[in-house]
Amino acid sequence: MARIAGINIPDQKHTVIALTGIFGIGRTRARAICATTSIAEDAKIKELSEAQIDTLREAVAEYTVEGDLRREVSMNIKRLMDLGCYRGIRHRRSLPLRGQRTKTNARTRKGPRKPIRK
């Protein structure tokens, strides 16, 4: 197993699919990385040489991925909550942020129903 950005990449998968296992890299970005490093998208990770894996590591290092990206997202949410803006308040109350109705739906975001006390 190759290790890129602190993640063990599965050997038996194609390069594009294997790169999407890294948080912050989707199909489009994985294809762009393969294009810049001139590695075939359908080549399996186990078929790549160590030099090609090193070029993949360098290409992935140019992007914000994994722990840094998770930290950045959580800091953005925390900033919204500290500002007290509408989106921050919705985050704090665990409600939908983007204008969805909450009278009947939004069970995933709100969690299980709480019984009404009498």
Swiss-Prot record:
Annotated region (Disordered), positions in chain: 94-118
GO cellular component, one term: cytosol
PROSITE patterns: RIBOSOMAL_S13_1 (PS00646), RIBOSOMAL_S13_2 (PS50159)
Keyword Heme in record: no
A Pfam family that the UniProt record links to this protein: Ribosomal_S13
InterPro entries hit by this protein: Rbsml_uS13_C (IPR027437), Ribosomal_uS13 (IPR001892), Ribosomal_uS13-like_H2TH (IPR010979), Ribosomal_uS13_bac-type (IPR019980), Ribosomal_uS13_CS (IPR018269)
Family (UniProt): Belongs to the universal ribosomal protein uS13 family.
Role noted for this protein: Located at the top of the head of the 30S subunit, it contacts several helices of the 16S rRNA. In the 70S ribosome it contacts the 23S rRNA (bridge B1a) and protein L5 of the 50S subunit (bridge B1b), connecting the 2 subunits; these bridges are implicated in subunit movement. Contacts the tRNAs in the A and P-sites.
Name of the protein this chain belongs to: Small ribosomal subunit protein uS13
Species of provenance: Shewanella sediminis (strain HAW-EB3)
Encoding gene (name): rpsM
